[in-house]
Amino acid sequence: MAIVAVYPGTFDPLTNGHADLVQRSCRLFDRLIVAVAAYPSPSKRPAFTLDERLALAREVLKDMPGVEVEAFDTLLVDFVRARGATVILRGLRAVSDFEHEFQLASMNRQLIEEVETVFLTPAEQHAYISSSLVREVAALGGDVTRFVPPVVARALARRYSGPNRDGDGDGQGG
């Protein structure tokens, strides 16, 4: 039986840390679905639309065997169940991530006990990278090429130059 995993996230934007986890998970799972959240949590203000995040993820991950990129707009466990997955993959950058991730894993186990959450840590050179930090550096004109794949760096440069420097695409500067 094939082992199917789901790696959920906002991926706004997809970073080298995300790509590293996906690449390494290809050795662990027969199929990995990178599940891009259609509706990020209310505390997040995405720089990229869902379609942009999907396109960037698909471009970056296109050569990785067994990897698919899909949007989801439901409860994660419902998406996982519908895809026949038995694993939820989560990344842990630091000890500070653990408490929140542990809570999510515990809740998911209550909702769908036949699915396990597997945590992977990024390679050391990616441990400090987060999408929010990358967005902040890019918005302030910094060089993000060490933190994201080239296609993402170009998209960030376009997003944070000109009239939409605030990144939300409305041109209102805030």
Curated annotation (Swiss-Prot):
Its EC number is 2.7.7.3. ATP binds at T10, F11, H18, G91, L92, R93, E101, H126, A127, Y128, I129, S130, S131, S132. Its cofactor is Mg(2+). Pfam families: CTP_transf_like (PF01467). It comes from Alkalilimnicola ehrlichii (strain ATCC BAA-1101 / DSM 17681 / MLHE-1). Pathway: Cofactor biosynthesis; coenzyme A biosynthesis; CoA from (R)-pantothenate: step 4/5. One of its GO terms (biological process) is coenzyme A biosynthetic process. Substrate binds at T10, K44, L76, R90. This is Phosphopantetheine adenylyltransferase. One of its GO terms (cellular component) is cytoplasm. GO terms for molecular function: ATP binding; pantetheine-phosphate adenylyltransferase activity. The record marks H18 as: Transition state stabilizer. HAMAP family: PPAT_bact. It comes from the Bacteria. Keywords: ATP-binding, Coenzyme A biosynthesis, Cytoplasm, Magnesium, Nucleotide-binding, Nucleotidyltransferase, Transferase. It is an enzyme of class 2 (transferase). It catalyses: (R)-4'-phosphopantetheine + ATP + H(+) = 3'-dephospho-CoA + diphosphate. Homohexamer. Reversibly transfers an adenylyl group from ATP to 4'-phosphopantetheine, yielding dephospho-CoA (dPCoA) and pyrophosphate. It is found in: Cytoplasm. Belongs to the bacterial CoaD family.
